C-alpha cells in the first residue's frame, strides 16, 4: 500500500487519541482510536505497522465515513519483562504518523485473580476431555479479561486519568468448589455468590489473599432451551429463568458469572473483531440470548462482556448511574471496538429492586467496607415505544462522541483513586482511615482528606448526588436537602472516598 492515493492532492494528518509519543503502556492489549484529517474521499484503509521485539505486526483497517479508525494490538509477553520499546507507524493517503512508546506490564500489590469454578460431578466424565475443556475455557477467560483491562484503561484515559486499570494476578486458575453441579443448578445467583465466596475464603490457596479480588466463572451453567422453545416465550426474563448455575453479580471481592454465553466469546486474539461484528442469529431453542434483544452473537458478546465491566465496577465500589457502564450503557461495548456502526436504540435496563443481592464479602480489607453492601442490578429490560425525535438525536450524538460506553465523572474519580487501579501501588502502610457521620453538625469527618462524597439510594445503589472535593479537606457538610434524604427519610446512604483510596458507607443508624 503506497502512502498516497492517486488523484488526492490534499495534505492529510493522522491524529491519535490518548497514545502519545514516549508514553508508557501498562496493559497488554492496546486499543488505538484516531482519524485522518481532513477527510479523504479516496482513502478507504489505513495501514498500521507495530514494531515490537524486532518483529512487525501489520494491520489494514477500514476508515469510517468520517475518516475515523480503531486498531487493537496484542503486546503480551512474559509478565516479568522490563520495559520494551515499541514503534507504531500509521499511513493513509498523504498522512503519516510515527509514535514511539514503551510497554511495561503493570505491577501492583492489589490484583484481580480470574477463576474457573468446577463443581462436584455426580457422573464422572472422561478426565482428559474435562481437563482439555478447562484449559480452553481458562484461555478464553484470560483473553477476554485482558480486553476488559484494556477497556478500563482506555475509558479512564478518555476521562483524563492515564494508566488507571486493574492488574491481573496471572492466568485463570481452576477452582474446585464444595458444591455439586446439582446443588449449583438448583441455586439462585445470590446463593451461588454466597456459597462460592465462602469456598474461596475457606481455601488454602486464596483465603488469606487480602489484596486480591476475584472474577469467577461457573463451569456447570446449563440452559434449558427446549423448554423455552416449547413455551414460545423468548423474553429476556424467560430465557434467564431457564438458565441454571448462572450468575451476573459483583460486589466486595467477587464478581461471579455463568459460562453459558461463552459460545459468542473469542478464544483467540485474532477472533475479537469477528466476534464483536458477528451478525449470526442466536437460535434461542439451543443457546441463551443475552444481547438486549439484538438476537445476534455479536450482541451477546457485547452485552455479556459489558456486564463483566459493570459487575467488576461494583467490586471497585461503584454504584449505579443512569447512563454509562454503570447504568444503561454497558450493552454498547461493541461500539468501543468498532467504527461506523448505526445508532442503536436498545430497551432500557431497569434496576431490579427486589433482588436481595449478596451481602457477604470476599475481602477482609477494612478500606472496602462499602463494597459488602447489597447491590441490586440493572437486570430487567423495559421495552419501550420508539423514542421521540429529540431522544433519537441525543442517542446519535452520545454514541458518536463516546460510544455510549463510558464511566460517568463520579465513577471515573472513584476508579482513578481506587487502590486496585492506581498504577504501581506497593503494599504500603497507610494511615488507618476513621470516617464518621456527625448528626449534630450534619457533617462527614475523616482523619484522611476526603476526595468524593456520593448519596446513593438504599433500594438500588443509584447515585442521586455527588460532590467532588478538589481541595484537601477533612470535613464535608451535607446540604439540607441531602441530609433530609439521609437522616429524615433514611432512603439513602452516603458513600465516602478519601485521597488514599479508603471507602466507606455511612447511614444515620451506622457508627
Where do the model's predicted regions map?
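Fold-level signal for large, globular catalytic cores of enzyme and receptor domains
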Residues: 243-245, 260-296
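Active-site recognition of the HExxH zinc-binding catalytic motif
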Residues: 302-319
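Eukaryotic short linear interaction motifs
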Residues: 121-125, 224-226, 264-265, 323-325, ...
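Active-site rim elements
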Residues: 135, 291-302
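Propeptide-to-catalytic entry region of secreted or membrane-anchored zinc metalloproteases
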Residues: 42, 53-254, 259-262, 272, ...
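Beta-strand-enriched, solvent-exposed domains that form extended recognition/catalytic surfaces
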Residues: 2-110, 434-511
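Compositionally biased low-complexity segments, especially N-terminal hydrophobic helices
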Residues: 159, 190-193, 357-370
Amino acid at each position: 500500500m503506497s502512502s498516497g492515493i492517486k488523484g488526492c492532492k490534499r495534505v492529510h494528518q493522522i491524529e491519535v487519541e490518548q497514545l502519545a509519543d514516549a508514553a508508557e503502556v501498562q496493559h497488554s492489549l492496546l486499543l488505538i482510536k484516531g482519524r485522518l484529517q481532513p477527510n479523504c474521499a479516496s482513502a478507504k484503509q489505513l495501514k498500521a505497522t507495530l514494531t515490537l521485539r524486532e518483529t512487525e505486526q501489520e494491520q489494514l483497517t477500514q476508515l469510517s465515513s468520517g475518516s475515523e479508525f480503531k486498531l487493537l494490538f496484542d503486546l503480551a509477553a512474559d509478565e516479568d519483562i522490563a520495559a520494551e520499546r515499541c514503534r507504531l507507524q500509521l499511513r493513509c493517503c498523504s498522512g503519516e504518523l510515527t509514535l514511539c512508546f514503551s510497554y511495561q506490564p503493570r505491577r501492583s500489590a492489589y490484583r484481580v485473580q480470574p477463576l474457573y469454578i468446577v463443581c462436584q460431578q455426580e457422573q464422572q466424565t472422561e478426565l482428559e476431555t474435562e481437563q482439555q475443556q478447562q484449559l480452553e475455557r481458562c484461555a478464553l477467560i484470560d483473553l477476554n479479561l485482558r480486553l476488559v483491562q484494556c477497556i478500563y484503561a482506555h475509558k479512564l484515559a478518555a476521562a483524563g486519568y492515564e494508566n488507571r486499570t486493574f492488574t491481573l494476578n496471572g492466568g485463570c486458575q481452576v477452582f474446585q468448589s464444595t458444591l455439586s453441579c446439582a446443588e449449583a443448578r438448583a441455586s439462585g445467583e445470590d446463593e451461588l455468590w454466597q456459597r462460592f465466596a465462602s469456598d474461596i475464603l475457606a481455601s488454602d490457596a486464596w483465603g488469606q489473599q487480602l489484596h486480591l479480588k476475584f472474577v469467577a466463572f461457573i463451569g456447570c451453567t446449563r440452559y434449558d432451551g427446549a423448554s423455552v422453545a416449547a413455551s414460545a416465550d423468548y423474553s429476556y426474563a424467560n430465557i434467564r429463568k431457564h438458565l441454571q448455575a448462572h450468575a451476573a453479580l459483583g460486589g466486595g471481592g467477587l464478581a461471579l458469572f455463568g459460562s453459558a454465553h461463552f459460545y459468542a466469546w473469542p478464544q483467540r486474539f485474532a477472533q475479537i473483531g469477528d466476534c464483536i461484528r458477528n451478525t449470526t442469529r442466536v437460535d434461542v431453542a439451543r443457546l441463551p440470548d443475552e444481547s438486549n434483544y439484538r438476537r445476534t452473537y455479536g450482541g451477546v458478546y457485547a452485552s455479556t462482556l459489558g456486564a463483566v465491566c459493570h459487575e467488576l465496577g461494583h467490586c471497585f465500589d461503584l454504584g449505579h448511574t443512569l447512563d454509562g457502564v454503570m447504568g444503561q450503557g454497558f450493552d454498547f461495548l461493541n461500539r468501543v471496538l468498532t467504527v461506523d456502526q448505526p445508532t442503536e436504540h436498545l430497551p432500557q435496563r431497569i434496576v431490579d429492586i427486589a433482588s436481595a443481592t449478596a451481602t457477604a464479602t470476599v475481602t477482609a480489607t477494612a478500606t472496602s467496607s462499602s463494597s459488602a453492601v447489597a447491590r441490586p442490578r440493572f437486570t430487567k429490560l423495559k421495552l419501550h415505544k420508539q423514542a421521540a425525535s429529540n431522544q433519537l438525536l441525543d442517542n446519535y450524538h452520545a454514541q458518536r462522541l463516546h460510544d455510549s460506553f463510558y464511566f460517568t465523572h463520579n465513577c471515573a474519580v472513584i476508579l482513578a483513586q481506587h487502590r486496585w487501579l492506581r498504577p504501581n501501588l506497593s503494599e504500603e502502610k497507610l494511615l488507618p482511615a476513621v470516617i464518621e457521620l456527625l448528626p449534630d453538625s450534619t457533617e462527614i469527618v475523616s482523619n484522611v482528606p476526603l476526595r468524593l462524597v456520593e448519596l446513593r439510594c438504599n433500594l438500588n445503589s443509584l447515585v442521586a448526588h455527588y460532590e467532588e472535593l478538589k481541595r484537601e479537606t477533612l470535613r464535608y457538610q451535607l446540604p439540607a436537602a441531602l441530609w433530609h434524604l439521609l437522616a429524615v427519610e433514611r432512603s439513602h446512604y452516603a458513600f465516602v472516598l478519601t485521597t488514599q483510596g479508603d471507602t466507606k458507607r455511612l447511614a444515620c443508624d451506622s457508627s
